[in-house]
């Protein structure tokens, strides 16, 4: 992978420092520009945060060892559902910075046109806030903070 990134940076004139993160790589290859994160709607942040969190969970599960896909799916589904995300927020909320808490609140208070089938409205709103926070941290390029919060919220024994 590193060799192909080096080759890509040599042939396309890409900045090697920017290639060290997924977001930087996407920005360079697709000519994207960073936007002011405060301009994103909380539901847009939740949209990307949902995918980021799902990828983190799936990566952890796959890296723990090869097993049947249906087992991976069941375990991942239990960890990404609204009820679990809501419970995680109860654990990690005291850890949030003022800025992170503001993003979480905006996501939690956003009025979504949909609702999870198997969650209470309170759980769904807290989960939306959690996903908005994950999206915000991803777009801020703070993956280490995402991992820190996920680890604290889930705990290693649940995975």
Question: Residues of each region from the PLM?
Answer:
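Double-stranded RNA-binding/processing signature
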Residues: 1-159
